[in-house]
Amino acid sequence: MIIRDVELVKIARTPGDYPPPLKGEVAFVGRSNVGKSSLLNALFNRKVAFVSKTPGKTRSINFYLVNSKYYFVDLPGYGYAKVSKKERMLWKRLVEDYFKNRWSLQMVFLLVDGRIPPQDSDFMMIEWMKSLNIPFTIVLTKMDKVKMSERAKKLEEHRKVFSRYGEYTIIPTSSVTGEGISELLDLISTLLKEN
């Protein structure tokens, strides 16, 4: 997929406040500070998504219109301890409404920090998506920070841990080096049937 143009067209803070569905969309979700905005910017090949040093900054669902046909959807980060219980409930209600009511959603990319073992909140997200029959692919982020000598071991550790939930594609990526970006775009292209 060649991304010719991208524009942030909607910031949804309440359930149902989404733009009309287009030909298709993919969504990105992960723990706070997993590198979601950086990965989106790498996919877009330009700085569109706001990158913050503060975890838990994205508290809305952000819809990016890509090539005037598709949405790339940035879901709020989860697992940040300093967020109040009320905010966590609002986040859950917003994301659950999106998952249940967005028929144009083809795939969720679950971003997991490749440097460390998956966290309990990652497993909870997997179980939640499985219970809602949401298709997902696991994307390991920040792989440039994993030593080359440890990469195969880290990948195998992640594969083994995630295998208890079934067989899932795992794509190692780095928004710094560009690793995995073209593979991710190819997969998205196939999902959205872009030629």
Swiss-Prot record:
Its cofactor is Mg(2+). Necessary for normal cell division and for the maintenance of normal septation. This is Probable GTP-binding protein EngB. InterPro entries: G_ENGB_dom (IPR030393), GTP-bd (IPR006073), GTP-bd_ribosome_bio_YsxC (IPR019987), P-loop_NTPase (IPR027417), Small_GTP-bd (IPR005225). Pfam families: MMR_HSR1. Belongs to the TRAFAC class TrmE-Era-EngA-EngB-Septin-like GTPase superfamily. EngB GTPase family. Residues 22-194 form the EngB-type G domain. Mg(2+) binds at S37, T58. One of its GO terms (cellular component) is cytosol. One of its GO terms (molecular function) is GTP binding.
